[in-house]
Curated annotation (Swiss-Prot):
Annotated Gene Ontology cellular component terms: membrane
A Pfam family annotated for this UniProt entry: PTR2
Function: Involved in abscisic acid transport.
Source lineage: Eukaryota, Viridiplantae, Streptophyta, Embryophyta, Tracheophyta
Topology versus the membrane: Multi-pass membrane protein
Membership in a protein family: Belongs to the major facilitator superfamily. Proton-dependent oligopeptide transporter (POT/PTR) (TC 2.A.17) family.
Tagged with keyword Membrane: yes
Tree of life domain: Eukaryota
GO molecular function: transmembrane transporter activity
Protein name: Protein NRT1/ PTR FAMILY 4.5
Tissues with expression: Expressed in flowers and siliques.
InterPro entries the UniProt entry points to: MFS_trans_sf, POT_fam
Keyword annotations: Membrane, Transmembrane, Transmembrane helix, Transport
Length: 567
């Protein structure tokens, strides 16, 4: 990291403090500044997951949506929230800073949660209670009540997206990437970011879910509202310690300009004079920037340099071309993680319904089915510090490298664990249906004589997969991306989650349509005990294996850009 002298104190080049003055080394940044970000993540994720983990039951039992629609609405809500992280990352890189984007986004989420709290508290804004257990006698939410619901939900979604697109990058920017110590601290930050994310999730799926089930949803939404408000206060308390990256303009403009310039030059007819001029311009450019040279990868983009001869707006520097190459080479890795997140989406919805049919008592306490994620969360809380303080130091000694385990190796482990998770889920569903059949309860709503702890097995594997993949992706995109595109690139981690949820919502109707057209009953109908959820899980397992082989193809060919990423 280059520094400039500011009096007797060196300043961070390209960074400012919260007053828009020069950020100074020793006063701004470091682990203290990042600690505020970690505390904020606990509160922010608590507010988010407190509702998301139980939302499918809220829509089904209080808004009277069908099982299929409530599941679809939840996956769409989650997907939209994560996809909007791209917008937050783009705005942070292009026009604002991660500091400003977080404050705006958290305020938007706060407003959305207030609306949801008001609706849950006022019966006039809710559909009337069902007159009987028959679904036909239940009035599904509609009209202005539905509008109130979805405005609140998608304000929350917009706020979550902005937070996810800015907060991880804001924390990672606090470290000096020019030193081994700074890079190691940044790696530790990403591990503990996932740890703190899990801390918030633990409170959400235990304490807040219990409140929602026993005290009412107005209390659940109220806790989330207070939590996001506290996150804003904690974030502001750290303002004097942060160093905020100064935006350098739209990264999308750079990408579009390079791609367009390369396309125009490639498609235009080349005369001998054009070739001469191009070589002349390129030689002149190389004289100005002797330390930079075009690489041999994605050579089709090298033609963007020639675009300077005819189009002033399309003039590209070597650095811009190389930056776009880096982004394009990361996209296949991004694409290979979508399937894992599709598996995560399926288990986060159907596993809740499975657990609702099983015996959820531990001693004399009846565990809410929405609290099932407590199992992977607890495991992630144990695994994250173990990974950072035991596994990584050991790996550094063995590999003699700064990073120990590469980002791509870490992501690969996560993909393998997701395959195991889906196989376990299929076997557990077979066991659950066998118990239902033997007890004569296939068509009954009575609790099955089988403990819900069986469901915990698939959650443990998927939670481990999520830990390895999410932390690996966040650090991979941040360290490999050009500095002007880091927030946007880091947002790809959340965009992968979004596309996984969208793929999940698309797969269910497709599978039902295909199985129905084959003369069978739809695999995923309304009656869970008559479904073929086990076959659906096996299908997901097979697709995950194919996806992993696809990942290996790209991971083996990827060449790291950043210092400290190579093992």
């Amino acid at each position: 990291m280059e520094v400039e002298m500011h009096g007797d104190v060196s300043k961070w080049e390209g960074y400012a403090d919260w007053r828009n003055k020069a950020a100074l080394r020793g006063r701004h940044g470091g682990m203290l500044a990042a600690s505020f970000v970690l505390a904020v993540e606990i509160l922010e994720n608590l507010a988010f997951l407190a509702n998301a983990s139980n939302l499918v039951l809220y829509l089904k039992n209080f808004m009277h949506m069908s099982l299929a629609r409530s599941s679809s609405e939840v996956t769409t809500f989650m997907a939209t929230a994560f996809l909007l992280a791209l917008l937050g990352g783009f705005l942070a890189d292009a026009f604002f800073s991660t500091f400003v984007i977080f404050l705006i986004s958290a305020s938007i989420e706060f407003l959305g949660l207030i609306l949801l709290t008001i609706q849950a508290r006022r019966p006039s804004l809710m559909p009337p209670p069902c007159k009987s257990s028959a679904a036909l006698r239940c009035e599904v939410v509609g009209g202005s009540k539905a509008a109130f619901l979805f405005v609140g939900l998608y304000l929350v979604s917009l706020g979550i997206g902005g937070i996810k697109g800015s907060l991880p990058s804001h924390g990672a920017e606090q470290f000096d990437e020019g030193t081994p110590k700074g890079r190691k601290q940044r790696s530790t930050f990403f591990n503990y970011y996932v740890f703190c994310l899990s801390c918030g999730a633990l409170v959400a799926v235990t304490f807040v879910v219990w409140i929602e089930d026993n005290k009412g949803w107005e209390w659940g939404f109220g806790v989330s509202t207070i939590s996001i408000f506290l996150s804003i206060l904690v974030f502001l308390l750290g303002s004097r310690f942060y160093k905020n990256k100064i935006p350098r303009g739209s990264p999308l403009t750079t990408i579009f300009k390079v791609l367009l310039a390369a396309s125009i030059v490639s498609c235009s007819s080349k005369t001998s004079s054009n070739h001469f001029t191009s070589r002349e311009v390129q030689s002149e450019h190389e004289e100005k920037t002797p330390s930079q040279s075009l690489t041999n990868s994605l050579t089709c983009l090298n033609k963007a340099i020639e675009g300077k001869t005819h189009h002033i707006w399309l003039e590209c520097t070597v650095q811009q071309v190389e930056d776009v190459k880096i982004v394009l080479k990361m996209l296949p890795i991004f694409g290979c993680t979508i399937m894992l997140n599709c598996c995560l989406a399926q288990l986060s919805t159907y596993s809740v319904h499975q657990a609702a049919t099983m015996n959820r008592k531990i001693v004399n306490f009846n565990v809410p089915s929405a609290s099932l994620p407590v199992f992977p969360v607890v495991f992630m809380l144990i695994l994250a510090p173990t990974y950072d303080h035991l596994i990584i130091p050991f790996a550094r000694k063995v590999t003699k490298s700064e990073i120990g385990i590469t980002h791509l190796q870490r992501i690969g482990v996560g993909l393998v664990l997701s395959i195991v998770a889906m196989a376990v889920a299929a076997l557990v569903e077979l066991k659950r249906k066998q118990v239902a059949r033997e007890a004569g309860l296939l068509d009954s709503e009575e609790t099955l004589p089988i403990t819900f702890l069986w469901i915990a097995l698939q959650y443990l594997f998927l939670g481990s997969a999520d830990l390895f993949t999410l932390a690996g992706l966040l650090e991979f995109f941040f360290t490999e991306a050009p500095s002007s595109m880091r927030s946007l690139a880091t947002s790809l981690s959340w965009a992968s989650l979004a596309l996984g949820y969208y793929l999940s919502s698309v797969m269910v109707p497709i599978v039902n349509r295909v199985t129905k057209s084959a003369g069978q009953s739809p695999w995923l109908g309304e009656k869970l005990n008559r479904n073929r959820l086990d076959l659906f899980y096996w299908l997901m397992c097979v697709l995950s294996v194919v996806n992993f082989l696809h990942y290996l193809f790209w991971a083996k060919r990827y060449k790291y850009i950043s210092t400290g990423s190579i093992s």
